[in-house]
Amino acid sequence: MSSGGLLLLLGLLTLWAELTPISGHDRPTFCNLAPESGRCRGHLRRIYYNLESNKCEVFFYGGCGGNDNNFSTRDECRHTCVGK
């Protein structure tokens, strides 16, 4: 195979990897956790991954404790738990 063909194959494989959504087996296990507001009394708008709806949704975080299913932005949540 020529070097041009190898570059084309590499480019196609890279594109495929970027466009393939994360499956349940590839998703970090903390994405499956229910949102936890934590033990503090803050009222911070945060995002969590909802396993049932397969969407990133809003919850209110107290500011400490909780779990790792807690994101600052929907984009961060989607990239981590839903896929690109």
UniProtKB/Swiss-Prot annotation:
Residues with an annotated glycan are: 70
Query: In which domain of life is the source organism classified?
Result: Eukaryota
Query: Under the cellular component aspect of Gene Ontology, which terms does the record hold?
Result: extracellular space
Summed up, the tissue specificity of this protein is: Expressed by the venom gland.
Ranges of residues in domain BPTI/Kunitz inhibitor: 31-81
What is stated as this protein's family in its record? Belongs to the venom Kunitz-type family.
Write down what this protein is called: Kunitz-type serine protease inhibitor B3
This chain's source organism reads Daboia siamensis
